[in-house]
Every structure is written in structure tokens, then in C-alpha cells.
Design a protein with these regions (language model features):
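Conserved functional hotspot residues or short segments at active or partner-binding sites
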Residues: 4
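P-loop NTPase motor domains
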Residues: 7-19, 25-27, 32-191
Length: 191
């Protein structure tokens, strides 16, 4: 797995039959930040772990420099936890929760803070930065996968990198179950 901010590994991936996944707001590529692996054999609860990750991602996305305040964090945590609990109770499956589902869950809260958070998510649901809203539509299982993050800029950079790292972690969990060890190379890590 390669995280490539300057498009230096695309030719290598193409030459070896690798998968190139372009991560940016303007592509048709979707990598769902809310993808979850329920078959985690670690001692921790995958729903709680993933909920914590999503709360951090949402904080980076709409919380600004200071992140979410405690009330906002609590509301996002509760909504995400509700989504994943329903997903797990329905047996998991292909259709994972999405940012749209989180938006709808927040909107259903009805209180002022929930509506504020739902409104803050709007640009990432239907607006110009909606590239992360929807089901993952790329193959993340190729043994040579390059995440091309060169198109991430501004406020989406931190969020996009968090999504990619989360997908890498999902891959680690799946590979562990299959007895495979992934290799991760992050180019320009200092950025």
C-alpha cells in the first residue's frame, strides 16, 4: 500500500497491475470514511473503535482548528454509534453507513446543535466537496494499491488523509484474518 502525494508511483502501480485510487473531492472515486470491518478479532469492540475514528474525522472536517466542542462531540458520537449498532444488528453486509446517513441521523435529532452539525456537513454531502459521501466504489483489495492524494488540498487534506489511513487500517484487519501482512509506504510523510 502506497500513499502518494505527488503522483510518483502511478506508473509503477500500472506496470505491476496495481490499483490506483485517486482521492479528491472532484473525482467519481468514492472511499467511504464510514466503512467498518465488524470481523475484528482483537479484544476491542470494532463499533466503539470506529465510532471514535469517525468522531475524530468529523472534528477535522467541520470542527476547524479547535475541533468539536464536548457537546458536539457527544452528539456525533451518539449518532455514529447508533448507525453502527443498527448496521451490526442487521448483520453487516455490503451497504455500509455513509456521511449521508450521519447527516440524516443528526438532522433527526431536532435540537439546535444537531441541526447545526447537520448543516455544517451539507457541503460534504451534496456540495462541491461531496467526494467522500457514498459507498466505496473502488477495489481496495489489490495487493499493490496506491492512494493518489495529490488532489487533496485545503480543508479536505487532513480529513482525506484520515480516511486513507482508516482504510489502510481496515485492510490490516482483513489481512490479519487471512494471515497476510501488508506493507505501507507513505511518501513525503513529513508533509
Amino acid at each position: 500500500i502506497v500513499i502518494d502525494p505527488e503522483r510518483e508511483y502511478l506508473a509503477l502501480a500500472a506496470a505491476f497491475g496495481g490499483q490506483i485510487i485517486q482521492i479528491s473531492a472532484g473525482t467519481g472515486t468514492r472511499v467511504n470514511p464510514m466503512d467498518i470491518v465488524l470481523e475484528d478479532d482483537s479484544a476491542s469492540d470494532p463499533v466503539k473503535d470506529k465510532t471514535n475514528n469517525v468522531v475524530s474525522m468529523i472534528g477535522a472536517l467541520i470542527g476547524g482548528i479547535d475541533g468539536l466542542d464536548p457537546l458536539q462531540k457527544g452528539l456525533v458520537d451518539q449518532c455514529v454509534s447508533n448507525l453502527y449498532t443498527r448496521y451490526r444488528n442487521q448483520g453487516g453486509g455490503v451497504v455500509q453507513p455513509t456521511l449521508q446517513d450521519l447527516h440524516d441521523e443528526l438532522q433527526a435529532g431536532g435540537d439546535q446543535v444537531s441541526r447545526y452539525l447537520a448543516d455544517a456537513l451539507n457541503p460534504y454531502i451534496t456540495g462541491s466537496m461531496s467526494g467522500f459521501n457514498g459507498q466505496t466504489n473502488v477495489d481496495l483489495s489489490n495487493r499493490f494499491t496506491v492512494f493518489d492524494v495529490s488532489g487533496l488540498s485545503g480543508e479536505l487534506r487532513t480529513f482525506g488523509m484520515m480516511v486513507v489511513i482508516d482504510q489502510v487500517w481496515n485492510r490490516v484487519i482483513r489481512n490479519k484474518a487471512n494471515g497476510r501482512r501488508p506493507w505501507l509506504y507513505v511518501d513525503e510523510f513529513h508533509r
